[in-house]
């Protein structure tokens, strides 16, 4: 009995090997449009991973322009500010229409204003963020930085303490100690 079963199994194996036609699972496969999108996003993140920040910023910026997604604008703006790249003013102008919709872009715009010594605009943007109920510690820390730049150390200490109470971060602690 097993001899016949083995014979049938070998016959199927040889028939499969001798077949000249190769069957494709999906013969009508076409390249998806999202494949290009995925490749471009991964390319931008690879540039960032390998510390090629200018190329990463440019790729995120072109993704934003092609797909009009503010997450790409956030990434481009963050890379530009964190690595002191060019086009900071251009990215700030691109972010302005979305400031009321996106807190991260508003925070980055305030950081740009602080870095370019436009302290009044930075303070105005941060006050708008601080009026929200969630009181993000990043907002408190950035507002403390603005107050330090204005030389209002007493109030800056208050905001740094509030931020440190929410997130025990050594960077905030160093800023708090630096005031004393």
Language model segments and positions:
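Sec-dependent bacterial lipoprotein signal peptides
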Residues: 1-17
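Residue-level recognition of tetratricopeptide repeat
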Residues: 45, 78, 111, 145, ...
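Short coil/turn linking the two alpha-helices of tandem helical-hairpin repeats
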Residues: 84-86, 117, 151
């Amino acid at each position: 009995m097993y001899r016949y079963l083995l014979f049938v199994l070998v016959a199927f194996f040889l028939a499969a090997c001798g077949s000249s036609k190769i069957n494709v699972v999906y013969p009508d496969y076409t390249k998806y449009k999202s494949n290009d999108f995925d490749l471009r996003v991964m390319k931008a993140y690879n540039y960032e991973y390998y510390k090629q920040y200018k190329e990463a910023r440019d790729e995120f910026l072109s993704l934003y322009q092609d797909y009009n997604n503010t997450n790409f604008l956030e990434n481009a703006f963050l890379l530009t500010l964190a690595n002191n790249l060019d086009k900071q003013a251009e990215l700030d102008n691109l972010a302005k229409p979305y400031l009321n919709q996106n807190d991260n872009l508003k925070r980055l715009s305030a950081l740009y204003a602080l870095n370019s010594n436009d302290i009044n605009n930075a303070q105005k943007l941060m006050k708008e963020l601080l009026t929200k109920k969630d009181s993000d510690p990043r907002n408190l820390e950035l507002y403390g930085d603005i107050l330090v730049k204005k030389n209002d150390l007493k109030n800056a200490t208050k905001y740094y303490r509030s931020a440190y109470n929410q997130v025990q971060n050594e960077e905030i602690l160093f800023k708090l100690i630096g005031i004393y």
